[in-house]
Structure formats: structure tokens, C-alpha cells
Amino acid sequence: MFHKFISTLTNKKITQTIMGTINKENIKPAMLLSAFGDACGYKNGIWEFEKSPSRIYEHYEYLGGYKNLKINKKDWRLSDDTIMHIATAIAITRPTNTDNESICKELAKAYIHSMEDMAGRAPGIQTINSVSLMTQTGMRSKVYQWNEIDFSDRAGGCGGSMRSMCIGFKYWSDEQLDTLIELSIESGRITHNNPVGFLGALVSALFASYAIRSIPPKTWPLKLMTEVMPKAREYLEKTSNSSNRNIENYEKGWNYFWNSWKSYLKLRQIPSNPDELKAANDKGIDYPVFPKDYSDYKVRENFYHSISFSGWGGSSGHDSCIIAYDALLGSADNWEEMIKRSVLHGGDNDSTGAIGCCWWGALYGFNGVPECNYEKIEYKSIIEGLAKEISN
């Protein structure tokens, strides 16, 4: 299904408009390195479901390190993360899109079609259940529309955050912020109707939009907490109803997501409001601040575990983005370090890898990345074609 959506439009390196500057050349690396992070973390199910980081590191070293990770369909197939990220990219680039609702309908269709290619890719239960409700079958009396999935306390997983990054590449400017907020939230809420889940989709897309503009990563949370979260709240109130999207049902999840980010930012001494920014500048704090022993993967593993909802770091909407962001901050432009921090851990590492490596690619392109990491990756031509479409 994917090939028919691909065009042959030419990508341009830098585009300057009245809306600002975007490094379009890095959309392709971002999309491909996201797929790398997914395929590497998944490792055909071997690494994603390995809870021991020591065993993952032993296997990684046995393979010869990142310069010898020859990603290919047989040994490193893509998981559900990238298949659904591809689906998101297809939906937002459809020529028939006229408004946000039409795009949301396309998102639902694309997610339904993506289920045809999920054998051996370990899709999440919440995604499977939601998509099945939107799928026409002979025995189903009601087929749910894209905005009819019920609210659930159990829908806070990372299924939304792992697939929304490309929305930030399509709607990257300040003038498009409202569209980014609405579409990223809905891209997650289509299957994960819980703030912990769909706000993760918002952060993934938002930070991608910052990365593709080369906005310094340490400034992202201030913009998230002061500019974007209030707008997201307004949108949820505007779309609230008395049934499946009641704002009152969202309070617990909203607060959990907000407090999780506040706690993380306090830990790293990253400002989350103007007063904290002024205080940090007055005190000369060089943030983010990491523990001295944070280069030890065991120390990172304990932290990833501590912020998770269920003990599996990165499996929810909040911690998938926090871990990916933490890895990005700690790695700077070092590709190997990004792999170690975002992918090589005992949690939901294909999702944190897909998100974090996407942001990294948007910032740094293929700088220092061995070609073997992506040259034979599954669906490479499709991903490249969609990157061109998004750049258009």
C-alpha cells in the first residue's frame, strides 16, 4: 500500500520563508535514523523484550559496536513503531487533505491499513484493540470513527509518541503551531485516548519541529511548558464532550504527564518557566546537569526504570519522550553515544530509539553515522520518498 503514495519531488537543502528557516535536508536522515533506532532496539524482538541491559551490551559488543551494525530486513526488521510512523507520514501527505478533520480520517485509514503489515513486528495491545474497533468486519455491529475510541485509564502507552515525529516536520513553523498541536494530539488519541498517551505524541512532534529548525535542545522544555501545554489544554477543552472525550476524565492523566516532566526538568535543573530561567542565568547554572556517574549504563537504567509507569522504561507516552530527550541532551552530536543512551537499555528501547534518533537526525543529519546503519534498512526507498513529500 505504501508505494503508491510516494512521489519523486526534489528535496531542497534549506528553505527560508516568512515563517522562518527549516533544514529540509535533514528530514530524510531524521526519518531513516528513526527507523534505525526502532530496528536496532527491536532486534527482531530479541533486544526489545530483553530486560537486562548487560545482556544487550554484551550482544552489542559481540556484533562489533555501532560501526558494524548492518541493519537489514532479515536480521533487523522494523517493528510496529516505524510501520506506523510511515502510516502517519502517508496520511499527512495525502493530496486530498483539505482540513484537520480530513487528515485525521486519513490517519485512521492509514493505521488500519498498517495492521496488514504487522506480522512479526509486535504491535501494542492498545493499538490493536483501537484499530480493530475502527475496522469493518462482517460480525461488527458498530464501526468506530477516528474520534470515537473510548477513554481508558490503560491507554497511556507509547503507541502515539512513537509514530508522530513526522508531523513536526510537516507543520514546523510558529504559525503552524496550532495545527501541529491538534494533529499530533489526534494522531495519538485515535488509538490512545488518555493524556499520558496522546500528550506523548504531541511532544514527539513538537520536539521534531524544534530539531529541524536547529533550536537548541536545552531550550525545548521551556517552550513546551509555557507556550504549548496551555494551548494543548485549550484544545482538549474545546473538543471535550460528555462521552469519550470528557475533560474531567483527563485530569489524572494530564497531571501525571505534567508532573513527570516537571520532576525531570527539576532533576536536570532545566528551566520550565521564565522565573526558573532567570534564576538559572543569575546563578550561572550550566544546564542540563547530569550525575557524575551517568556515563554508566547501569545508572541510566535505574533512572529510566524510576520514571516509568510500570517499570519498563519508555513504554508510556511520558517516559518514552523523557528518555529520548535525556539521551539527546547527553549525547550532543555523538551518534554512538545516542545509540547507547536511547537504544541500549532494558526498557521499551525501540520506541525511545525511534523517537530520540529521529530528533538527533533532524539536528545533525548523517554526521558520523556509518552507512551500514541505514543503507539497507527495510522500506528505505519508501521512507526516503515520504521524506521528500513532507519536504514539499
Curated annotation (Swiss-Prot):
Gene3D superfamilies: ADP-ribosylation/Crystallin J1. It catalyses: N(omega)-(ADP-D-ribosyl)-L-arginyl-[protein] + H2O = ADP-D-ribose + L-arginyl-[protein]. It holds the Pfam family ADP_ribosyl_GH. GO terms for molecular function: ADP-ribosylarginine hydrolase activity; metal ion binding. Its cofactor is Mg(2+). Binds 2 magnesium ions per subunit. Substrate binds at residues 109, 159. It comes from the Eukaryota. InterPro entries: ADP-ribosylglycohydrolase (IPR050792), Ribosyl_crysJ1 (IPR005502), Ribosyl_crysJ1_sf (IPR036705). Residues 125-127, 192-194, 309-311, 315-316 are annotated as: Substrate. SUPFAM superfamilies: ADP-ribosylglycohydrolase (SSF101478). Mg(2+) 2 binds at residues 348, 350-351. Keywords: Hydrolase, Magnesium, Metal-binding. GO terms for biological process: protein modification process. Its EC number is 3.2.2.19. Monomer. Specifically acts as an arginine mono-ADP-ribosylhydrolase by mediating the removal of mono-ADP-ribose attached to arginine residues on proteins. This is ADP-ribosylhydrolase ARH1.
